[in-house]
Regions:
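Signature for phosphate-centric chemistry
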Residues: 21-148, 154-324, 328-416
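Bacterial Sec-dependent N-terminal signal peptides
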Residues: 1-23
Length: 416
């Protein structure tokens, strides 16, 4: 009976779903096919202009959260499944040259991932070092002082390594900086708070995602570029959707690894766009301010918002730290951005319109938020938000980019 209910619910979900097509998202993906990787996409370094700080204000503090940089896989089953199916096709003499190359390269990446499971990749180290250098360059006057910096990281090795790379780059710019770095389980209650998330959101959102996997994907089109005889090849797939999904994983993580091969180019654009859409939807429903689950998911970020407030007020009141750095993960960061009402995370979308939010633009590897604090001659404090090197805003509080800190605090504490 339970299985019948699940099947019926999945059918109803698929019938009520509309595969919307946001022209902005489509253009963004066409410009660079690697962006189909969603949150596996690497950091894009771009140059931005910044507003002049109001006269009479001086930077006195900076608070930050950065997602770990590009990494190796955290599991092996995706590569293993793709290798298994491609090997079957090879034995049947059905792989074309692109399919053969995909098999060879996937085997090499699989070995690489097994040796470095969960760890930061060389690209990830480079991302955080470069982000730190750009932050230093933007605020040279502040960072050339004898500052004391506190850094905390998730207990995951890739986050600790990101912190070390980031802070090492800062010290190379100014050897007089004092660093107090730490990583403890106790920090996880706010730096990566997802306790109870599986029961409250994940399983319910999963039903929606499963319904799309089986209704809008066309795995024949994903397999076509790899084989010599599509009809014969397709007979060897008992779960073709699974192959397509894992092919997307293999193609997505490739750009994070120390390899030049880019399998994403093998997936036809229309199919790649659908894969992006589903993964983008998955991320939004599970961790952003969705109509369906936002009221349940976003309050998990309150503890992180309080950490930002508490540490900022400590510093502004004469505390010993001039900079607070945090290194964690994308899931809590998405919820936090939604909680604080950050631009591009402040709008609420239902499951039919989540492609108005673009994960590979706003939550790629090494995504970070830097909040700069400036004190005026009268003692008042204003703040500016820098998201992935881009000056941004809190739309509910006005156009910005500078906001009164007391107003920001009151707004955050009144949320949820």
């Amino acid at each position: 009976m339970k299985r019948i209910f699940t099947v019926l619910l999945t059918l109803l979900l698929s019938l009520s779903f509309c595969f919307s097509q946001n022209p902005q998202a489509e253009a963004f993906l066409r410009e660079d096919i690697s962006r189909v990787a969603c949150n596996y996409h690497g950091y894009e370094f771009k140059d931005y202009k910044y507003s002049r700080v109001p006269k009479g204000y001086e930077m006195v503090y900076l608070s930050h959260y950065g997602r770990h940089g590009s990494r190796y896989m955290t599991y092996t089953k995706g590569h293993e499944y793709v290798i298994k199916k491609l090997t079957q096709l090879q034995k049947a003499g059905l792989l074309n040259a692109d399919g053969e190359e995909l098999l060879r390269q996937t085997k090499e990446m699989h070995v690489m991932n097994e040796k470095n499971l969960h760890n930061l990749s060389p690209k990830g180290y480079q991302e955080h070092a470069r982000i730190a250098e750009r932050m230093f360059a933007r605020e040279k006057k502040f960072f050339r002082k004898d500052l004391r910096i506190r850094g905390i990281a998730s207990t995951a090795d890739r986050c600790q390594s990101s912190m070390n790379s980031f802070c090492g780059a800062l010290v190379r710019q100014n050897p007089r900086l004092t660093m107090d770095l730490d990583s403890k389980e106790e920090y996880m209650s706010y730096i990566s708070n997802t306790s109870g998330f599986e029961e409250t959101v994940h399983d319910k959102a999963g039903l929606i995602i499963d319904s799309l996997n089986n209704t809008i994907l066309n795995p024949r089109e994903a397999i076509r570029p790899l084989v010599t005889d599509l009809d014969e090849a397709y007979k060897l797939f008992n779960r073709p959707v699974r192959f397509e999904k894992y092919l997307h994983v293999v193609a997505s993580i490739a750009e994070d690894l120390p390899v030049h091969y880019r399998p994403m180019k093998l997936i036809p654009f229309e199919e790649a766009r659908k894969l992006w859409y589903i993964k983008n939807l998955d991320l939004y429903l599970n961790h952003c301010n969705s109509v369906e689950f936002g009221d349940i998911r976003i309050p998990y970020a309150r503890s992180l918002a309080e950490d930002f407030i508490t540490k900022a007020d400590e510093s502004l009141s004469g505390g010993c730290y001039d900079v607070d750095l945090r290194f964690g993960h994308d899931y809590p960061l998405m919820a936090f951005f939604s909680y604080i009402g950050l631009d591009r995370f402040n709008e609420r979308y239902d499951r039919n319109h989540t492609d108005n939010w673009i994960s590979s633009r706003d939550m790629h590897m090494a995504t970070n938020l830097q909040i700069e604090f400036f004190r005026g001659k009268k003692g008042d404090v204003i703040v500016r938000f820098i998201h992935n090197d881009r000056e941004t805003k809190i739309p509910a509080l006005g156009p910005g980019p500078f906001y009164d800190w007391e107003t920001v605090k009151a707004y955050w504490r009144d949320r949820y």
